[in-house]
Amino acid sequence: MAEGWRLFWVGVELGGGWADFAVRGRRLGFREGQPILVSPDGRVDARLSEFFGRSRFASRATGTRESYVLDYRLFFSFLWWSGRGWDQARVEDLEDWEDWRLRGRGNPRRIGGAKWIRELAALRLLYEWAAARGYVVSSPVWLRVVRTSVGAAVRVPELAPVDVRSSNVKWLTPRAFRLWRDVGLRG
């Protein structure tokens, strides 16, 4: 497969033909640590740069931003290899991507439901932002309404898996609880 989207970070000095990349990025108003995605044909999309620097994405924790931008790079590369730009993503593309990521027979790096939920959250953040600004016709992340255990209605991605544990909770057996209570609390 041809090379996909490339990721750079403002403030990171690069060698080769990219030696002045960080300096040029700062001069253009990019923030320190801001990601820059470069398409396979060498272009930087100003709309993505706006998203990375001036949206809810920019206020996310550093680890979240780093994870999300890697998800964007993979999904955009998938779209590119399918003949589409990031702003042309369709629901069908996301369905194909979900199938490849979770169940793809030739995929050596399949992922689980928890990582897929994170990827959906990343894509939902981007595409809802882009749709609100008219950069895309609509988000490829379709939503449905579900009821929580207390009866509140929430919108969740249609492709969200239903069998995902949100945390790895370890429960104490009654015997272990009594031991913890007697030794840990009572001394």
Please name every model-derived segment.
Residues 49-63, 73-162, 187:
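N-terminal core-binding DNA-recognition domain of tyrosine recombinases/integrases
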Residues 153-187:
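Long, amphipathic, Lys/Arg-enriched alpha-helical "connector/arm" segment
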Residues 39, 43, 92, 167-171, ...:
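Alpha-helix boundary/N-cap detector
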Residues 29, 145-147, 180:
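Compositionally biased, low-complexity repeat tracts
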Residues 72, 123, 173-177:
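A structural signal for well-ordered alpha-helical scaffolds and beta->alpha junctions
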Residues 1-60, 66-73:
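Basic/aromatic DNA-contact patch characteristic of tyrosine site-specific recombinases
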